[in-house]
């Protein structure tokens, strides 16, 4: 699932089928994440032509280790007004293919040594997904225990970012914690989780 269709945000038919099989299987194994929702309703939103770029973004989430799945907690589930389904990165730990990145491009440019290849904000934008907010991260953690060994960057309020900081979260001691770092920092056990509205 690594190669896209002529570098466009489209998948080849065989890539699409492999991805949909993986998504359907994960959906069926984790019904606690989306009680009352049927896979057929989700797949209908992913069918061409509307699902083209969305499938590409889901494939990027999958390719980088996010294990995307539809999540329907009370506060952040299907949008009743728009009828959207929302896919979240549901890997047990922060996605392996997105680790060792700083927070954003400004932070990347400030690094004098150990230049990094990417940053969380730009990487998410290139994938067509959104970083989780603190509220969204906490709601996700109500479903299962995520990030017990890793941590994930989250959207940082402008006032904190203006002063050079950035926020990240994890779960330790059966509690969800929010921390701060310099935005230019990076760690092998820190990545980011995203969401995709379909």
What do the predicted segments below correspond to?
Residues 2-130, 134-198:
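A binding-site-centric feature that preferentially detects glycan-recognition modules on secreted/surface proteins
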């Amino acid at each position: 699932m690594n190669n896209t269709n002529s570098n466009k945000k489209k998948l080849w038919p065989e890539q699409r089928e492999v991805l949909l099989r993986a998504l359907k299987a994960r959906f069926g194994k984790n019904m606690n994440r989306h009680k009352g929702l049927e896979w057929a309703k989700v797949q209908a939103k992913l069918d061409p032509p509307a699902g083209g770029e969305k499938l590409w973004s889901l494939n990027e989430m999958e390719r980088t280790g996010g294990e995307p799945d539809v999540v329907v907690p009370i506060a952040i589930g299907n949008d009743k007004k728009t009828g959207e389904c929302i896919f979240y990165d549901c890997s047990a730990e922060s996605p392996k293919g997105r680790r060792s990145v700083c927070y954003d491009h400004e932070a990347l440019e400030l690094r004098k040594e150990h230049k990094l290849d990417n940053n969380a904000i730009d990487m998410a934008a290139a994938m067509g997904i959104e970083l989780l907010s603190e509220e969204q991260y906490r709601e996700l953690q109500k479903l299962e225990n995520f990030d017990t060994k890793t941590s994930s960057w989250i959207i940082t309020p402008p006032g904190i970012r203006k002063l050079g900081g950035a926020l990240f979260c994890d779960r330790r001691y059966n509690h969800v914690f929010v921390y701060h770092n310099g935005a230019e920092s990076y760690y092998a056990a820190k990545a980011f989780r995203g969401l995709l509205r379909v």
